[in-house]
């Protein structure tokens, strides 16, 4: 899906008018503006490299308190997983860029910076995710949940984080509201539903990082017993860590 043309055409209007256009907004506009300086082919390469680098480094930093070995393992899992592989095969570079922002968002929200500094830095690290509606929403949810996980959380501060997170979704929320009448494809939910690519059902497939709907984007390792056993073991470790076991 990650297709770029050498000379992208200017947007027909300031506001996208179809569901498909909204789905790629404001990424298309940013790509068009940047194409005057950075060729679209180079933009693609930068997005892919940045997505993997940011995901690995961010996840490693997120668990750095657990030691170098844990940080290295977390970074490896963040960039070498069924989820990342599936999105690369689908050509979902912008989606991976949003995914890569999540550990950085958690780091910033849980930092000891002053509120204003934290909010400003939060917007900065969330900008790549906000290039697509999916990335913006997931980044917003992550920011709020990260704030709620703080020991010194307050309702007012969580509300402030939610307000900041809502702001970076405005580039696509406002066009959707102002244009109006833009309906979603009724066949979309069925076409893009979770797939049980592990043989263990859709929920286990998703929890193990898989579940992509396109058979061509499902790694062959998803049907390998050894790989599945390793994935289940990793899932068990994650659950144990969350429960504090």
What are these regions (language model features)?
Residues 10-14, 161-244:
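Periplasmic/ER-lumenal interhelical loops and adjacent helix-loop junctions
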Residues 26-27, 41-59, 225-244:
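Hydrophobic alpha-helical transmembrane segments
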Residues 7-14, 35-40, 59, 64, ...:
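Short juxtamembrane and helix-loop transition motifs at transmembrane-helix boundaries
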Residues 65-66, 244-245:
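Cytoplasmic juxtamembrane regions at transmembrane-helix boundaries
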Residues 1-55, 76, 81-99, 201, ...:
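Membrane-interface coil-to-helix junctions
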Residues 41, 45-48, 68, 129, ...:
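Membrane-water interface of alpha-helical transmembrane segments
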Residues 56-62, 70-149, 158-176:
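Membrane-embedded helix bundles of polyisoprenyl
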